[in-house]
């Protein structure tokens, strides 16, 4: 079990977090289950790696890739944002992928990861109001360190939390009827 989460000692949030000032803290926890977790503060290491003013672990799902857990983060540097996947093994940072930036100015948010045909696949909700029920998500794929391609994927998506498992995408369903949910094959 691996967890990534944020906390704050004060009143700072994502939009007013600053690398050289008060900022969101980043934590990892890992163990064999909820009653057996070890914790480590990754704030300094992740801010240094990414050059971030703010970052948080996305609420999408993750996978193991090449023997490490892939953890997706939304990273803000000034006014620019991107997704950054970092790799953890037993509370240690063991690698990172290149920054993932959406084509054409699309801002990426909550990201679920999967491994499909040996490639790491990122399935991203769009950031901001346009991402909630916009009818598109952003897909990107690569070897786990570099992104080889990306595209907008049109589907009826309410912009909510979602999960990929292999080539299956599980999400709440239409914006006006979430009760049943949907499973969509990529």
Predicted regions: what they are:
Residues 1-55, 63-110, 114-160, 165-186:
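Beta-rich carbohydrate-recognition and catalytic domains
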């Amino acid at each position: 079990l691996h967890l990534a989460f944020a906390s704050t000692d004060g009143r700072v949030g994502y939009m007013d977090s600053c690398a050289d000032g008060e900022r969101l803290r980043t934590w990892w926890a890992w163990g064999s289950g909820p009653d057996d977790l070890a914790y480590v503060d990754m704030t300094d290491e992740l801010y240094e790696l990414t050059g971030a003013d703010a970052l948080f672990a996305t609420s999408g799902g993750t996978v193991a890739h090449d023997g490490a857990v892939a953890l997706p983060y939304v990273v803000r540097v000034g006014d620019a944002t991107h997704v950054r996947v970092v790799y953890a093994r037993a509370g240690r940072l063991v690698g990172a992928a290149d920054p993932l930036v959406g084509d054409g100015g699309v801002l990426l948010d909550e990201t679920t990861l999967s491994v499909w045909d040996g490639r790491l696949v990122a399935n991203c909700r769009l950031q901001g109001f346009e991402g909630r029920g916009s009818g598109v998500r952003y897909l990107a794929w690569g070897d786990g360190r570099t992104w080889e391609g990306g595209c907008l994927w049109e589907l009826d998506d309410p912009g909510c939390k979602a999960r990929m498992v292999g080539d299956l995408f599980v999400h709440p369903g239409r914006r006006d009827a979430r009760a049943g949910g949907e499973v969509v094959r990529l």
